[in-house]
């Protein structure tokens, strides 16, 4: 990932994270039968330092997964989700980051983690067009915002 966009260390939200991330990726899809599909995409993120803040986010292992069954030629139902685990500490000025929460100091390097699982529906129509909706409930969340993920995609091919 390349740090594009505007960055200001004084702002809470920015369009850039102001550091490079090297992220090797591995993915595969297995079709054990004509109607079933199992897919996995795994990455490992090596984050570089943000030189404006002397902050370096920890390394992150992450994977997305899905399993689906083709009910009809136009309808697939399944499960989907993701897992994320930060494997090294966040550091600032070379020191492990410590935060205070609920009146106690948390000395875990702000290592984030989350697991999510939920249903998925994929519908094909008009020969090659498709619509997909996925929802996932997050569990076992640490050191990151917690919530549910809702993802919708509409694909309509066209010719030039």
Listing of model-derived features with the role each one plays in the protein:
Residues 54-160:
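Outer membrane beta-barrel transmembrane domains
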Residues 1-51, 104-112, 159:
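Outer-membrane pore/translocation modules
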